[in-house]
């Protein structure tokens, strides 16, 4: 048989000792000991009853306080901003007996300086219902209208125009929809997509990926299409800005839009910001007496700061597109901001044939159509004009009530687009 554990053995030894003691005690001693035990039991029962009553009273107080909190938390709140969070550490001073003590001055812990939407600046020694560790300067909070106690934290405030920049629906374009730009696709993927999907490969080599990419080239060569395809291939948030959208009437409004856009991108990182027609704000700086020009320059300076300032974030990538790279400011073009410049030239003959095939793949095309010959006939055409050729060919087939598009339709479409390309339009007021 195994021996009992030490605790059980000790308990058995105590019981044996008690039995021996009881056997040696007289009847009067046993009666006296029983009375003492009864008294102790009665005292413990009274203490238990008193403790239960205290617990019940505390529960009632908690319930009352929760009701008061519910009353205080009734909407609407007053909106305020945290200006500063302070640590309260009062010096211990010997107080005389009977001296009045200022409780606020003796508080320890965190307190807050608050600025409300009514333009009041308020010091709060007691923060309220929000954990002080979760607060930071600049946070938006809801406070009580009378006591100014912080009742709840509110989501960050962004300009409604910036919220509208977020692309909710993923673009449907694919890299297969882009013809003749294989080198440009590879450069864009290396600079934008790979740092987001394979960050460890850059860390192993010890290199920092580019912060931004500039797509430049003549109009209609596929710059915006490439950016949309890039957005479709990544799971990142995609913000689309237009350069003219950042030029605002009021001073500081354009810079605030840029700031808010990057702040929203930081919150929703990883994120890609696409700025189309960046030449609207990124032109070379010059001395001007016109306040509008200076405001445009201020907007560009804010963009430079966000790209390469103290608050820049590696999880935010910028794609900028322009067809006038020659007028952009050198500070915007320097390395460290828009590191990689990708040129989009007019498509070559092989690329033109591929673009015509891409745009006509959903059309009912006659098998005799020779795209290589059509590509030779479309010298100096860009991608947009080649798409127009396919549309014109389809319209001509529709005019003939044909069921398929022939080679002659494409030839006629080329002639029509070429005529529009060469004709000069004059507008008169």
Swiss-Prot record:
Keyword list, A-Z: ATP-binding, Cytoplasm, Nucleotide-binding, Nucleus, Proteasome
Alphabetical GO biological process terms: proteasome-mediated ubiquitin-dependent protein catabolic process
Major site of localization recorded for this protein: cytoplasm
Signal peptide region: none
Cellular-component GO terms for this entry: cytoplasm; nucleus; proteasome regulatory particle, base subcomplex
Family recorded in the similarity comment: Belongs to the AAA ATPase family.
UniProt protein name: 26S proteasome regulatory subunit 6A homolog
Organism: Oryza sativa subsp. japonica
């Amino acid at each position: 048989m195994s021996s009992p554990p030490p605790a059980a053995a000790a308990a058995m030894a105590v019981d044996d000792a008690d039995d021996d003691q009881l056997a040696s005690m007289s009847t009067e001693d046993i009666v006296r000991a029983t009375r003492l035990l009864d008294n102790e039991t009665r005292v413990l029962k009274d203490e238990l009853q008193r403790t239960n009553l205290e617990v019940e009273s505390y529960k009632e107080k908690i319930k009352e306080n929760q009701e008061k909190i519910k009353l205080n938390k009734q909407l609407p709140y007053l909106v305020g901003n945290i200006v500063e969070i302070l640590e309260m550490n009062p010096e211990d001073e010997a107080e005389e007996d009977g001296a009045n003590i200022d409780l606020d001055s003796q508080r320890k812990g965190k307190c807050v300086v608050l600025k409300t939407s009514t333009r009041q600046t308020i010091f709060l020694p007691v923060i309220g219902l929000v954990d002080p560790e979760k607060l930071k300067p600049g946070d938006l909070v809801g406070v009580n209208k009378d006591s100014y106690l912080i009742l709840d934290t509110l989501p960050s405030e962004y300009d409604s125009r910036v919220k509208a920049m977020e692309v909710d629906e993923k673009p449907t374009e694919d890299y297969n929809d882009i013809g003749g730009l294989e080198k440009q696709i590879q450069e864009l993927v290396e600079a934008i997509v790979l740092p987001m999907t394979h960050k460890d490969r850059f860390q192993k080599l010890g290199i920092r990926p580019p912060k931004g990419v500039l797509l430049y080239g003549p109009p209609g060569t596929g710059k915006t299409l490439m950016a949309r395809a890039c957005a479709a291939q990544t799971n990142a948030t995609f913000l689309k800005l237009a350069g003219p959208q950042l030029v605002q009437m009021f001073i500081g409004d354009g810079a605030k839009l840029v700031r808010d856009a990057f702040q929203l991108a930081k919150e929703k990182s990883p994120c890609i910001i696409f700025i189309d027609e960046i030449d609207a704000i990124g032109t070379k700086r010059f001395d001007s007496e016109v306040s509008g020009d200076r405001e445009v320059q201020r907007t560009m300076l804010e963009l430079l700061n966000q790209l390469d300032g103290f608050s820049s974030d590696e999880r935010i990538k910028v794609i900028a597109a322009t067809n006038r790279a020659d007028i952009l400011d050198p500070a915007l073009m320097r390395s460290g901001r828009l590191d990689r410049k990708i040129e989009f030239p007019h498509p070559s003959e092989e690329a033109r044939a591929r673009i015509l095939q891409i745009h006509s793949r959903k059309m009912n095309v006659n098998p005799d159509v020779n795209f290589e010959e059509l590509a030779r006939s479309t010298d100096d055409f860009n991608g947009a004009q080649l798409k127009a050729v396919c549309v014109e060919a389809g319209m001509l087939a529709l005019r003939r009530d044909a069921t398929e598009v022939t080679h002659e339709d494409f030839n006629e479409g080329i002639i029509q687009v070429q005529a529009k390309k060469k004709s000069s339009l004059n507008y008169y007021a």
